[in-house]
Amino acid sequence: MLLALALQVASTPPAPRDGFAESAFAHFSRVQTLTHSSETVDVAIVYAPYSTAPPAYMMRLTRRRFQQPDAIFWADSRSCPAMRPVLDAMRALASPQPQVPGIDPYGDIILDGTGYRLTTRARFANRQDGDLVYSSNIGTPLAAWVDGSLGALARCWSATAPVS
């Protein structure tokens, strides 16, 4: 697990520098280290001043392949009905429990080279805000959610950025 995490961090290049990633409230990714490929999704809310309409969301997918230029795709919740269920499922995602070496038994080591990561805003039960960073390998709720989300959003992506 630690080896896979180290490989994931080492192989994940920075996001495009267009300001979108910085305004996003969530980022999730799947990194396949053995093939030097990754898919990273940044999620941002689209604010409409003085609007009573439900919030809209925008996502950017950055697809990286070995020795190829990055491919950027966009999706918008106003034209992608799959987006809201993906975000609802993110809110319901099961979190792992902290593990203390020497107290807790060690888990299995998986060296398949696929890493999953979610970084998002979070809130504690006492309504205090924080950040959540969750990474794992295959066979976890995070892996299932990322794979399922990428599949659910597959028809939504466009090379043209939506109008905010």
Labelled PLM ranges:
Residues M1-V9:
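Sec-dependent N-terminal signal peptides
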Residues V9-S164:
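Function-determining sites in protein domains
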